[in-house]
Amino acid sequence: MLLTSTLLLPQQAGIAEAAGNSQSMKTKIMLDNYPLDFQAEPIIEQGNTMVPFRGIAEALGIEVLWNAKDKTVTANQMAADGKKVVVLQLNQKTAKVNGQAVQLSAAPFARTGTTYIPLSFFSKQFGAQVSWDQKTKVVSLQSPPKKMYSMAFYAVKAFGERQYIPQFDTVGFGWARLQEDGTITTSGKDFYWPQAAGEITPEGIVDQAKQEGTSPYLMVFASDRKNELTKMLEDSALRDKAIADIVQLATDKNFVGIVLDFEGLGLSGDIGKAKRDFNEFVTRLAQKTKASDLKLSLALHPLNGAYQGYDYKTLATVADDLIIMAYEYTGKKSPEPLDKVNESIKLALKEVPKEKLVLGISTWSENEKTISSVIGLAKRHQLKGTALWRLGLIGEASKAQIDKNVIPLKS
């Protein structure tokens, strides 16, 4: 998804010819294989593909400042190799990049309130990979690597990819769950405390993660398939015991945080009550985690999914971050529809600051050809980061694509 190498546009003459042969077609821009919306269309001008600067730049996480007096545009990019400051002046073919003069293939210009620059400049100066399809008039950009929060989950059958743990900022270990009687256990059928593998113990894996700079979180799973989650939330005694047991387990086992994956609320019934009950649980849990110096993360169903029992706005005020589980839209082992993933992000952003949102990505759904596009949406919307479900499913090919896109904060 994130590609550090650059590709120059094909011969600009070819672009001009394509424009002449397909006047009825509008130029379309794809960023990380997903359409980028524009208030103004790209323009073919004297053989150069000119694009609205602000729209692409901000989608790449670049800050754009306009100086009306000097008629200059300043772009500030925090790139993987440091900060880059680019100053463009209207109607001038020379730009300044970190104070050094750089020639452009065409001078930037303003039209109907929009500043246009040569598309190739994004490749040369901002690390985006660019290509052009003459037949379809589609400009494709691949965003450069971005330093952002990276999380992964370690649960059943994850042992075979434990070598990836140090390559994430945080790993959530799914070793506990809510039972049907409303109590917490580490001996569930699907989420359980694993046995040692020779000399390698689960406690040792957690301790080694900490030593290597990865924050280990205890992940606690719950389902409402048999009403067990609702039962616990509505019973104050069960609720308080679950909170105490979760915090005690996390502290006893040397975790630095807790991530709740409480699923199934709000499919039917009193959705408002489901939200209030979960809010109450999380608020009480947050009081205990703060007192114990533990972080708190919540993995939540997306707002455009079937389960509506999650009050993103309120939950974000008490948790450290929210993970949007933007997957399982189709129920099939196939890539998630990007329109739905994008919609889930936009809905969440209406309720929660982007700095508190993490995009959950299922590596059961995605593969090495699609995962870059999903990560691209997290970058486009400038979310806190990504969370991968899960180790054991990623594979070398997908991991290589992840590494091309995301640079962990710990790096």
Predicted segments, located by residue:
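Primary recognition of N-terminal secretory signal peptides and signal-anchoring hydrophobic helices
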Residues: 1-167, 178, 218, 253
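Active-site clefts of carbohydrate-active enzymes
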Residues: 220-221, 228, 348-373
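Substrate-binding cleft of secreted/luminal carbohydrate-active enzymes
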Residues: 249, 361-411
